[in-house]
């Protein structure tokens, strides 16, 4: 009720659980959800930008759901990420979402808690569905929806947020190129190749990128600490390469499955 007092739909954080805090696969879900639900979604809500729902821990005003009623039920049966699409469709109809961050009387964060995959193959399979559904099928199904009649700045912000949602494939390519460059550079030095002197502009760009990397790791650790304590925050830094590798594996699988779908294979949950 508190969340819906000033918004059309509300979301509480989702906190993934792991059997052991140091779990590399299950733990990376917690790192990503903490950053998303404590940083990104509150910012989107504050900017009145398109805000997806998580499928659990969310509530809606009836009149907001009626605005997007098509007579075929609230969720599309042929969608891989029906919860994500619901939030985007609501935002495009003019509905406003909010991220509700509150603590109970015991001091614990009010959140939806659940276990996530702890094996690499299971994580890649699940995140393939997310990436394909948001970045590829979602583009086909939804296009780039924004609330009609909203100010230009609000529409541009919503389009930017949609791009952020769909940039996973581009991020995977950049990550793969970066890791390949690191491996090749180390191999070249190990084989006795002399270090190259970089142009000042290139050197400055690399230092800037390194600073941004530290900034991103610090933010991830900060928000993971909020959900899992200091130890969880430190582990979030160490697990960043795990997140990156899973993204690269997921991107390849999402592209493969999407191409198969374009050639006629029926859409199905894997």
Task: Report the location of each language-model feature.
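Membrane-embedded multi-pass helical conduit in multi-pass membrane proteins
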Residues: 164-260
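Short active-site alpha-helical segment characteristic of glycosyltransferases
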Residues: 82, 86
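Active-site-adjacent bridging/hinge elements
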Residues: 34-37, 59-69, 102, 145-152, ...
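Membrane-proximal soluble regions of multi-pass membrane proteins
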Residues: 126, 130-142, 147, 235-270
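Catalytic donor-sugar/metal-binding loop of nucleotide-sugar-dependent glycosyltransferases
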Residues: 87-107
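Active-site donor/metal-binding and catalytic loop motifs
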Residues: 100-120
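Long, K/E/R/D-enriched contiguous segments that form extended
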Residues: 113-194
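Long helical/loop segments within the catalytic core of UDP-sugar-dependent glycosyltransferases
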Residues: 2-79, 91, 120, 124, ...
């Amino acid at each position: 009720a508190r969340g819906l007092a000033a918004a059309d739909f509300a979301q509480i954080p989702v906190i993934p659980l792991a059997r052991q805090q140091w779990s590399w696969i299950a733990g990376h879900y917690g790192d990503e959800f903490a950053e998303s639900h404590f940083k990104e979604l509150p910012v989107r809500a504050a900017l009145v930008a398109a805000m997806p729902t998580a499928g659990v821990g969310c509530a809606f005003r009836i009149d907001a759901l009626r605005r997007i009623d098509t007579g075929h039920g609230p969720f599309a049966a042929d969608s891989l990420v029906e919860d994500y699409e619901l939030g985007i469709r609501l935002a495009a109809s003019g509905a406003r979402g909010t991220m509700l961050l509150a603590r109970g009387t015991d001091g614990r964060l009010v959140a939806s808690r659940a276990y996530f995959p702890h094996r690499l193959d299971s994580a890649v399979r699940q995140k393939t569905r997310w990436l394909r559904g948001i970045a590829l099928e979602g583009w086909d199904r939804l296009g780039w929806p924004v609330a009609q009649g909203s100010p230009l700045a609000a529409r541009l912000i919503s389009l930017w947020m949609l791009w952020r949602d769909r940039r996973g494939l581009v991020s995977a390519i950049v990550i793969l190129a970066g890791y390949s460059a690191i491996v090749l550079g180390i191999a070249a030095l190990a084989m006795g190749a002399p270090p190259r002197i970089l142009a000042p502009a290139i050197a400055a760009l690399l230092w800037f990128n390194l600073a941004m990397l530290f900034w991103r790791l610090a933010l991830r650790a900060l928000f993971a600490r909020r959900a899992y304590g200091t130890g969880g925050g430190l582990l979030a830094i160490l697990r960043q390469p795990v997140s990156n590798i899973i993204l690269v594996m997921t991107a390849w699988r999402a592209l493969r499955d999407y191409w198969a779908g374009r050639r006629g294979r029926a859409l199905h949950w894997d």
